[in-house]
Structure formats: C-alpha cells, structure tokens
C-alpha cells in the first residue's frame, strides 16, 4: 500500500475495531489506479459523526450535519465522512438534506463520476460497484447512473467533467457529453466563485488543449463570465502552450490575450478574482506590450517589472509563440543580478535627503526626483552612492535651470 494510505491506516483500524466499516474513497483511490501523484486521502465510514468524534482525541467539526469530521492523525488532517445519500437538490447546486446510511454502495452511488466512486479497504482490495476501473482503463469520464440526473442535481458537475479532461487527458463518454450539451443552461444557477475554482484547475491541467474546445462544443462557454461572444477564439486558444505556465496570474493573462480581451480588468473582475491576481495579470500583459521581443528589455523596464514578473512575461510570450522561454529566463536572471539595485529601497538616498538638498517643502516633486534617481542608477548613469547622487542631482538641476 502506498505511503499516503499507510499513514491513514490507523484511522481505518480504529473504526473497524469498534465495529464500523471504513474505506478509502474518492480522488486518492482514483489517482492510485491511474498512477498519478496521490493528494488528500479521504475516508468513508458507517460510523456517525458523533461516533467518529468519540473515537479520536483530536477532531474538527467541519460539517457534521453533512457527515464530515476532520480527524487529525499523526499530525495530518483527514476528512472522515459518514456513508450518506443525498436528498432532492436545491437550485441544481446542493442537496436540501442528507441521510446517513450504513451501506458503502449507497454512498458511492451518490458520487459524480464512476472513477470517483471507487473505494479501497485496509488490505488494498478495490470495491468498484459502478465500473470505475473500466472507465479508467478506457480513459473515459462516465457518470454514476444517468448523466442527465447527475447534472440536474449539481450543474457544476458539467464543468468538473471538462476540468477532469484537462487534468487527466480522459475523454467524455458519449452519454456524458450529450447530457452536458442538453443541460448546459443549468450553469446559470452556479455561483461565479464555483465556476472560477473549476476554471483555474482546468487552465492548470496538462491537457488544456483538449478541454478548452469542449467548453465551446458543449455550450458551457455561454454561461461562463465574459465568454459568450468568444466561442471561436476559445477553440483557437487550445493551440497555445498552456502547460508551460506555472502561475495562475500567467494563465489568466494568457486567457485574456488568447480571447483578445481589450478591457482586462472588467473581464477578470467578472470572474471575481482577487485584486492581486487581476493587478498582476494586467501588469504582465502591459509589460508584454511594452517589451516587443525578449532581447529588448531595458534595465529600467527590468527593474520596474522585477525579476518574477519579467519571467512571467516571457513565460506568457513563450506560450503564445510556442518558443521555449528558458534561454530568455537565464539571460533575464543574469541581467537582473547585474543591476546596481534590485528595489527602490536599496537607493543610497531617500526623500528626506532630497528635501534637505533642495531646501523646499515636500510635494509630488519628491517622488519625481527619486524616480529620476533610480532610473539613473539602474542605467549606470550614476553610481549608487549618496555623494555621487548629490553631485549628479545638482548638475541635473543646473542643466534644467539653464534650459528654462
């Protein structure tokens, strides 16, 4: 048994010692069978939440009314969820109620896709009542039961299906794809925040080229923020090298450029992204326009952007052009390391020095003067020493006075 499961065996065994059933379930079991890196290990049990909390000394009630308790075991947190069935779904988003049951199969039956409805016992025996292993072998995403019913229960499952295409490289089964086309309008019931979470995972997957056209083909695009008029560009966006990007800001910047978004901020705000992400994606695209070619970075532009943003700019450019960015990254690192200063805080002078030298009250001119100083320093026009900067500034002022 793989280490992530071995580390959680103590929870399974404790539950079984007290007469309860307990199994590993969900994405960890799926990823084990696929051969992917295993993430969080989840456990399903016949024990009720209050029974779970009695059996373990350190638990966190994160949703006991829905059956979930976090058990902290040997320093690691595990979600332990009681077998349950879901009641009728409210607004195609969430069940109005849940009913705790004692049957593993009933619990697995409520899950979205067959590959996620597989369990494993403490000996490593696989329990697969809905054909999840066959779907994995055929590299297909199939729903548990009728696809139409699953998507009417929770419309976000349609977006999850396409996201799994991006993450796993699997295809949608014919029934799954057909049901998404039929039920795509139900996405109108889903919050933007939930859509954004799935979209970010989709854009980060290694098989984005297969997933993006599916958003267009299934009609999901029409219910995603800002995409209703972008169907052809969405298909074309599959041609870019998305897997070369490592940061969410880079992916959103590439999406904006791929979709020819003119006004970036409203588009990204519609996805309810954090301001920090919006600002950075916008700054990446602005720098991409200001520096037309990788070899055309000036010292001033490199300093203003900072190394991390400059590297992101070249990563996005590489993804757009299909040319590897590593050689340009190495050159940017070398050039940035050679800059006399890396931040404005490293300047040998500050605003107080400038005010004292000028002998006049503070005002907007102070920032303008400091900006002129750092530009002169990074372009090697003057050394970053207080005396030399003072002399340079006095000469600059004399020249300015003569010209006036």
UniProtKB/Swiss-Prot annotation:
Name the catalysed reactions: a tRNA precursor + 2 CTP + ATP = a tRNA with a 3' CCA end + 3 diphosphate; a tRNA with a 3' CCA end + 2 CTP + ATP = a tRNA with a 3' CCACCA end + 3 diphosphate
UniProt keyword annotation of Transmembrane present: no
rRNA processing listed as a keyword: no
Identify the cofactor(s).
Mg(2+)
Q: What Pfam family is a match for this entry?
A: PolyA_pol
GO MF annotation list: ATP binding; CCA tRNA nucleotidyltransferase activity; magnesium ion binding; tRNA binding
Q: Where does CTP bind?
A: 27, 30, 111, 154, 157, 160, 163
E.C. number, please?
A: 2.7.7.72
Which GO BP terms apply? RNA repair; tRNA 3'-terminal CCA addition
Keywords attached to this Swiss-Prot or TrEMBL record, sorted alphabetically, are: ATP-binding, Magnesium, Metal-binding, Nucleotide-binding, Nucleotidyltransferase, RNA repair, RNA-binding, Transferase, tRNA processing
Matching entries from CDD domains are given as: NT_ClassII-CCAase (cd05398)
Tell me the InterPro entries matching this sequence.
Bact_CCA-adding_enz_type3_sf, CCA-adding_enz_C, CCA-adding_enz_firmicutes, NT_sf, PolA_pol_head_dom, PolyA_RNA-bd
Say which family it is in: Belongs to the tRNA nucleotidyltransferase/poly(A) polymerase family. Bacterial CCA-adding enzyme type 3 subfamily.
HAMAP family with a match to the protein in the record: CCA_bact_type3
Report the protein's function: Catalyzes the addition and repair of the essential 3'-terminal CCA sequence in tRNAs without using a nucleic acid template. Adds these three nucleotides in the order of C, C, and A to the tRNA nucleotide-73, using CTP and ATP as substrates and producing inorganic pyrophosphate. tRNA 3'-terminal CCA addition is required both for tRNA processing and repair. Also involved in tRNA surveillance by mediating tandem CCA addition to generate a CCACCA at the 3' terminus of unstable tRNAs. While stable tRNAs receive only 3'-terminal CCA, unstable tRNAs are marked with CCACCA and rapidly degraded.
Whom does it interact with, and what assembly results? Homodimer.
One further remark on this entry is:
A single active site specifically recognizes both ATP and CTP and is responsible for their addition.
Q: State the name under which the record lists this protein.
A: CCA-adding enzyme
Q: Which organism is it from?
A: Geobacillus kaustophilus (strain HTA426)
Q: What is the lineage of its organism?
A: Bacteria, Bacillati, Bacillota, Bacilli, Bacillales
Gene name in the database record: cca
